[in-house]
Amino acid sequence: MTTEKIDNITVQTQANVYFGGKCISHGITLADGTKKSVGVILPASLSFSTGAAEVMECVGGACEYKLSGADDWVMSSAGERFSVPGNSTFDIRVAPGFDAYHYICHFA
């Protein structure tokens, strides 16, 4: 099931813009203090580093990802999630001509 809305949040109004605008996100804080980000990745191939573990939830579009040390790319589309260990890296790509990848990043 895809998350369609999140109630009772505080939104950081200043966007986080990465990779020349290919990835744009906003930080959110839930009423219980839990932090997440919601964003979009436009067609591109990008590499990210994590501090804390993350769960990436696709809420629209699709991407392929490859975790650090993995050989194969894995597809993720709306309603699917993938986990990224803390203190690691992962690659993500959205193919040209495909819809943007819309996501919620759940921090551990």
What do these predicted ranges mean?
Residues 29-31, 66-68, 93, 106:
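A generic structural motif
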Residues 27, 55, 81, 91:
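Short, surface-exposed charged micro-motifs
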Residues 70-90:
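Short acidic-glycine-tyrosine-enriched beta hairpin
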Residues 29-51, 81-86:
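Conserved short histidine dyad/triad with adjacent acidic residue
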Residues 50-65:
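Short, conserved beta-strand element in jelly-roll/cupin
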Residues 85-108:
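Ligand-binding loop in jelly-roll beta-barrel domains
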Residues 38-40, 46-51, 67, 73-75, ...:
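Short histidine-centered beta-strand/loop micro-motifs
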Residues 1-34:
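A short, N-terminal "cap"/entry segment at the start of jelly-roll beta-barrel domains
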